[in-house]
Amino acid sequence: MEVFWARGYEGASMSELTAAMGINSPSLYAAFGSKEALFLEATDFYSHTEGADIWLALEEAPTARQAIEQFLSLTARAYAQSDRPQGCLITLGALHQDSSRGAICDDLRRRRAENHTALQKRLERGVAEGELPADFDASAAATFFATVQHGMSIQARDGASHNALLATVAGAMAAWRTLAGGSAA
């Protein structure tokens, strides 16, 4: 998983993958069938193991504002860990459908859409609980905060520090009042 996370689908060579797994190419093909299938397994594993605290905080925070702030702050911490590849495998794993396999791009696109839906549902809960105005555009706000998270992934990959990512979080949260129609809640 970490080879794909660090290098992306296209950048990960078979020799790097087999070395990381401690097996030879025939064993990899026997176990997974293809590099594509291995990547899909790796992204599934990543989705279930990395960043679980980010998505748990989104659900458990008492207010939508706190949920988004924790979501972004925990993202900043996760993306800047020095002992792991920086950024997000789901965001950076394969961005070019013309060079990556269609199934891989489709899978990553689906996962990003699921993340957007989780953000949107949490914001809709804020509307239902009266924290946010009835005309609050939860989909647009979810798109904004997902885009911030994706941008933080790119910045982390480019070497941004945890503090630099937290500055991005502060900037994104400064937009909360505008997005929430003047509500600081």
Residue ranges and their predicted role:
Residues 41, 55-86, 138-145:
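Hydrophobic alpha-helical connector segments
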Residues 3-37, 41:
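Helix-turn-helix
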Residues 3-4, 17, 28, 38, ...:
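Hydrophobic packing within well-folded, soluble alpha/beta domains
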Residues 51, 66, 102-129, 140-143, ...:
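Amphipathic alpha-helical packing segments from all-alpha helical-bundle domains
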